[in-house]
Amino acid sequence: EHIDYSQVSGDWHSLSIAADSMDKIRENGELRMHLNHL
């Protein structure tokens, strides 16, 4: 699903994650998260 972020008002904060094992931060990795509620 494509989200047009320009239509969502408010403050936005970027977050970066890093890990010594790329498998942990790949899609479906244990350190990945998806926020679906604003």
Swiss-Prot record:
SUPFAM superfamilies: Lipocalins. Its main location: secreted. The keyword Transport applies. Keywords: Olfaction, Secreted, Sensory transduction, Transport. It comes from the Eukaryota. The keyword Secreted applies. This is Odorant-binding protein 2. It comes from Hystrix cristata (North African crested porcupine).
